[in-house]
Structure formats: C-alpha cells, structure tokens
C-alpha cells in the first residue's frame, strides 16, 4: 500500500476536491464520529472539511470532533510507516481531543493522557487505569513482533478496545490505527460504516468465541 499512501499524501498537497484523499477524509470522519453519537450528516461533514462552515443546525461539539478527526487523519498519514508505540497513540489522542468542550470542562478528559477512571465498552469490563501503561506496552510489543497480517491487525484492534486506554475517544483512535496499520502492512484499508455498527459491536463483544464477526 506504499503507492496508496503516497497518493494520499500527494493529493493532500494538491488540495483538490473529489479525489480519494478528500473522499476518505469525509467518509472516515463521518462514519467514525457517527458511531460515537455525532449528529452531523455526511453532507455537513463534507461542508466542514471543504469550507469550515456548515448549513443547518449542528452541535459545536460535533463540529469540533469532525475538525479534529480531519487533523487526526493527516497525523496518521504523516506517521503511517512508523511502528506502533504508546507515545504515538497518545499523540493521536491529543490531536483528536484537543480543544473539545469535554476536555475544557473536565480534566479527566484531558487530551493525550491515559484514563484516570474505569470505563467500559459495550458492557464489557476494560483494563483498570493503573494497569493501562503495562498492558498497552505488552500488546504493542506482541503485535510488532508478529507478522502483522490482516488477522493480526484486527486482533490488535479488539485487544486495544478491551484495554480502552483513554477516558474517551478509544473507538475513533482504534479505527484510525486500523486504517494506519493496513496502509503500513500492505492491506487495503477500510472504513467501518456507521450503518454496520451493530455488527461491529457484536464482533467486539463476541470476538473470543466468534472472531468471524470482525474478520
């Protein structure tokens, strides 16, 4: 996927509408944020990307989330060839959550730091805050030492979400890492569509017994 990565970077420099970079930015931001509860339409997401304005009613928080997601995609393109590390994931989180109402109103949601309070995903118990650094480092070490085939990338995503290292933003970071690792390892990258989120969450919940829901 080296050619695709370079094409994304080339098209970003050109700043033209309608190319694959433009299309991926809009579709990835729309779907990943919508899975997490954003009310923006895909057209509104497109308007924000193209003009930094939006027609119709839109929550300020949703606009900020979309804008930050565009920046996160660019940060991912800049680091796509780098190995995973806790520091890289923390930097992604800082980009995603920078300037949000949530981060401004409660230090628990500060950007670029691991969670301070327990959280959950789909009713599943996640890693305790004090255990996050060690478990995440171990997960990354195992992953980086493997073949990093498609199945390994999906397995990493599942185990990252089970750790749920951040107070908020884990799903969006996890899905961006999925995209990054596909680009890095010669796998065609893909977007998890919002209209399939029921199957996506089922896949996360049942992965140990039925990995096929994610694969």
Residue ranges and their predicted role:
Residues 1-215:
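FIC/Doc superfamily catalytic core
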